[in-house]
Structure formats: C-alpha cells, structure tokens
Design a protein with these regions (language model features):
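Single conserved hydrophobic/aromatic residue that forms the stacking wall/gate
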Residues: 2-8, 13
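Solvent-exposed, flexible loop/coil residues
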Residues: 6, 122, 127, 174, ...
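Alpha-helical cap/lid subdomain in secreted, periplasmic
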Residues: 19-150, 205-208, 216, 227-238, ...
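Glycan-recognition and processing domains
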Residues: 146-216, 227
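Short coil/turn motif common to extracellular beta-sandwich-like domains
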Residues: 217-221
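Extended, polar beta-sheet/loop recognition surfaces of beta-rich domains
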Residues: 285-297
Length: 297
C-alpha cells in the first residue's frame, strides 16, 4: 500500500522561479517530498531565470532524502516558453524535462485542435489541457515501470561536486520578515507600522500614509516581494541600498485582473554583507505600500 500526499506551493504571484527558489525550503522541501515536479510558466527565457532555476533544482537535489526531481515545461498561446533556459539546467543536472509545449504546439499548428480547446486564456490549461499534461507525466513514469529491470532503483545522494551552470547564484535562498531579525532588522519603522499578510507572505511592513522605513539586511542578493493592488491607492516607492538609488517600484495595478504579490531583485553582489536599505513612498496621491517580505540569498 502506498500513501500519497500532494505538497503544493502555488500562489497568486508572478516572477515564478525567482520567488520559488526563496520559498522552496520553507513551503515545499520541509515536507521532504519524494518526487518534485517544477513548473514555472511566468519565467522569461533568459539568463536571470536560468540562474533561478539552477539554484532551485540544485537545492531540491541536495535534500537529505534524495528526491526525484523533474521539470515540467508549459507554454503560452503564442508558443513562448522559458524552455531553452530551463533545458540548460535540466541537462547540467541530468534530470528529466517533460515538455507540454512540445506536445501541444505541433498539434495546434497541424490543425488537430486549437489553443481554445485546451485553455480558457492565453496561459492556463483547462481540464483537457491538464489531461494532456497528466498523460505526459504518466507516460514518463509508465516507461520507467515498463523497464524497471534495467533501471537503477537505488536513490543516490547528489554529487555536490557537480558544477552549477550559472554558479548557484541564489544558494541558501530564504524569506525575510519581521520574524527573521538575524537577516532583516528594522532600524526605523517610520510610518510602516502595519503588519502585512497576503497568502503565505506574512509579517511584512505596510503604510497607508506614505513615509519611509529603514532596514539592515545581511545578504549577497536582495529582492522585495510587494503587494500590487487594483484599488488605485498603492503608489510608487524608491529604494536605496547603502545610500545609493537602486530601484523604483510601482505597486499600482489599477484596473488589473486582481491583487497579487510581485517580486523584484533590487541588489546583487558576490559576497554576503550587511547593508542599509531604505524604502520611501514618493507618490503623495497614492500613499499605500506593502513590503510583504524580503528575498534573501
């Protein structure tokens, strides 16, 4: 008898694997999954997201319970996909990549069905789309089962000498909040007195009156998860690191499809150090701003 438990880490977020590599340990890997399927359609097909996927896959492979790891590659209606960037990572670590993109796009081009048959929009599969996706996974597993006598069934520890294709930029990635003062310390809360929560992003900092908040953050790379809202009240914040202007972040999503958490990398370097970080709302007409969490690596 086999007991199966599904551990899901999906949320109403964007910039997928960038947030995913920071959330993975807390929201997925602590459950010690035996099989990990990684899927991120919101990634771009570029070096940044290749580096995010590199660190995420490596983090999964390094787990003590030696899980099986694979990448599932989706598609948009226009055929765009981060597949090329993700494939480089899959090949570097010799893990399977199953391509929904390669399965459906040739069939659509051949006229066997339309995109509308498998999706209600330009990205997300409907029930029929998910049936195709599931069939690709079951076919892959079934092929292993059919050839089980020739398969090495021993779970081996990951060889840590394996070269990371992009240098494991986001090694030890984690989430910073009010509860992690060892890496994120609020030095001057200012007007950001609200304790924010959105889905699993808890213990953040928010203001409804504009103003400034200051931190000391110990990291090599720093990113911000902030709250995009459709109510027209969230505005623009300027971010400084060690006194230097590094980012302007606009949390206004007026007339958009809904509120969501968005991430942006604001600082990167080669060494871990403690930095002063200052966030100031600069739009007096739209004084709301929520820092849901910090992305630390």
């Amino acid at each position: 008898e086999i007991t199966t438990r599904l551990v899901g880490s999906e949320m109403c977020i964007r910039d997928s694997s960038y947030i995913g590599v920071h959330r993975a340990q807390r929201d997925a890997l602590e459950a010690k999954p035996d099989i990990i399927v990684i899927e991120f359609i919101n990634d771009a097909d570029d070096e940044f997201y290749e580096s995010c996927m590199d660190s995420l896959v490596r983090m999964c492979l390094e787990q003590d319970n030696n899980p099986a790891v694979m990448i599932l590659e989706p598609s948009t209606e226009g055929g765009t996909s981060p597949q090329a960037a993700h494939l480089k990572v899959a090949q570097a670590y010799n893990i399977p990549m199953i391509s929904y993109h390669d399965a459906v796009m040739p069939e659509i081009e051949a006229g066997n069905f339309t995109w509308a048959d498998i999706s209600p929009d330009n990205v997300h599969p409907n029930d029929d789309g998910h049936v195709i996706m599931a069939s690709l996974l079951t076919k892959f597993v079934g092929n292993i089962k059919d050839n089980i006598d020739s398969v090495d069934k021993e779970a081996k520890a990951f060889d840590t000498s394996t070269v990371a294709p992009t240098g494991d930029v986001f090694a030890d990635a984690t989430i910073g909040s009010r509860q992690t003062e060892d890496i994120v310390k609020t030095t001057d809360e200012g007007t950001f007195t609200d304790v924010t929560t959105f889905q699993k992003f808890t213990d953040g900092w928010g203001t409804t009156t504009g103003g400034t908040i200051k931190f000391e953050i110990t990291a090599k790379n720093i990113g911000m998860i902030y709250y995009m809202t459709v109510d027209g009240k969230s505005g623009v914040a300027a971010v400084k690191v060690d006194g230097e202007d590094v980012a302007t972040i606009n949390a206004d999503f007026t007339s958009g499809w809904g509120n969501y958490a968005k991430a942006q990398q604001i600082y990167s370097s080669d060494e871990v150090a403690t930095h002063t970080v200052e966030v100031t709302v600069v739009d007096d007409a739209k004084p709301n701003f929520q820092i849901l969490n910090w992305l630390i690596s």
